[in-house]
Each structure stands twice: as structure tokens, then as C-alpha cells.
């Protein structure tokens, strides 16, 4: 485990418990004051708390507490506030902000996936300046797949629940297209800190998460 990852171990555990407690409280609240749909969302949220741990186990990754913390904060904003609390409808522009954030973070996930799939050199993850555009296009592609996949999920939910999560009745295809567009904008915005890291070695917040992953999983080098 890298020193950077270890420094966030306690904060990661606090975020994990906070997300779980939030889902439990909202499940009880929705049981008495809302609909079965929101009770289901709250209970499902409890399952999502374990997603980072499950992903590590399935992919045989080492524990990276900084990446875990980022995942819990993202789940809280996108799922906890956005879906369980219904923030997408209650808070102006929250939907578009979260889709942009999704583009940024899944661009980061795409970059991590690029080096996870890339053959290691002497058992280590090695980042080369020359492969910036390869990694950048790959990361944006992952974000695009997620954006399209999410819209497919919303379409399927509408077929089952008839709750129009894509707002087709009042916006036509506008909401769906804007969601995908701002997600891609977020993925392209991620290229800025990514380029600074490749060109100048500037780590920053987002690339710090990436570097923590590299060092935690087989001692990455740049």
C-alpha cells in the first residue's frame, strides 16, 4: 500500500459508514413517509456501499483507500443525494453537474483501466509521456460507454416502472442528449490535469488518485 493511500484509510472508513448509515436512515424514513420505490432505492444503496470492495476482490486489486474514498463520495452525491433524496428533481442543474462530474471521474477510471490492462514492466505499472493520446482517447471512450450505458438503464427503468427518468414527455430527447454531452465535456476536461501530469509531472487531486492506484498496485513509476 502506498503512503498516500494509507493516509486516507480512516477517512475512507468514515465515508463508507456514513454512506451506509445514510441509506439506512433514508430507508426507514421512506418506509413511513414515501413510496416503496424510494424504500427500494435506499435498500439498494446499502448494496452499493460494498461495490468498491467487490471491485477490488473481482479484479484482484490491492486496497487503495484514496480510490475507495473517492468512490464513496461519488456514490453519495450521485446516488444518495441524486436518487434517494431525489436531488435531480429538487436541486436546479444538479443533474447536469453530476453528469459532468461522472465524465471527469469515469475519465479517471478509464485512465486507471488503461494501465491496469497494459502489460507491466518488471511487475510495475509504468507511465510514459509518449502514450498520452492513447491513454486520453481510451479514458474518454470509457466515459462515453458509461454515459450511453446509463441512458440505456434509464430507458429500461421507464419500460418497467413508467416513471420517465429521461423526461421524454416534457423535453423529448433534449435531456438524454444533454446528459451525454455534458458527460463527454467532463471527460475532455479531465484531459487538462492529465496533460499536466504527463507533460510536467504535476499530480494535483485527480492525478493523485491515479498515482496512488499505480503505487498501490505493483509500485507504479513515471
Language-model segments: what does each one mean?
Residues 1-19:
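N-terminal membrane topogenic signal
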Residues 132, 174-222:
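Primarily interfacial, aromatic-capped hydrophobic alpha-helices that serve as membrane anchors
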Residues 49-53, 74-82, 107, 111, ...:
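Alpha-helical transmembrane segments of multi-pass membrane proteins
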Residues 31-37, 61, 84-94:
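Membrane-interface helix caps and helix-loop-helix hairpins in membrane proteins
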Amino acid at each position: 500500500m502506498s503512503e498516500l493511500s494509507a493516509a486516507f484509510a480512516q477517512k475512507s472508513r468514515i465515508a463508507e459508514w456514513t454512506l451506509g448509515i445514510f441509506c439506512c436512515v433514508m430507508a426507514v424514513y421512506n418506509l413511513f413517509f414515501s413510496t416503496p420505490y424510494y424504500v427500494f432505492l435506499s435498500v439498494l444503496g446499502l448494496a452499493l456501499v460494498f461495490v468498491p470492495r467487490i471491485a477490488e476482490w473481482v479484479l484482484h486489486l490491492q486496497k487503495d483507500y484514496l480510490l475507495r474514498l473517492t468512490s464513496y463520495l461519488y456514490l453519495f452525491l450521485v446516488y444518495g443525494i441524486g436518487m434517494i433524496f431525489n436531488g435531480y428533481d429538487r436541486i436546479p442543474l444538479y443533474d447536469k453537474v453530476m453528469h459532468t462530474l461522472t465524465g471527469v471521474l469515469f475519465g479517471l477510471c478509464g485512465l486507471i483501466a488503461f494501465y491496469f490492462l497494459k502489460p507491466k514492466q518488471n511487475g510495475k505499472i509504468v507511465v510514459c509521456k509518449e502514450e498520452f493520446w492513447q491513454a486520453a482517447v481510451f479514458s474518454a471512450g470509457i466515459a462515453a460507454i458509461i454515459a450511453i450505458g446509463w441512458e440505456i438503464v434509464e430507458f429500461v427503468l421507464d419500460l418497467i416502472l413508467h416513471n420517465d427518468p429521461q423526461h421524454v414527455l416534457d423535453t423529448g430527447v433534449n435531456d438524454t442528449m444533454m446528459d451525454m454531452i455534458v458527460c463527454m465535456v467532463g471527460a475532455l476536461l479531465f484531459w487538462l490535469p492529465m496533460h499536466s501530469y504527463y507533460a510536467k509531472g504535476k499530480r494535483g487531486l485527480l492525478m493523485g488518485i491515479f498515482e496512488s492506484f499505480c503505487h498501490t498496485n505493483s509500485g507504479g513509476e513515471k
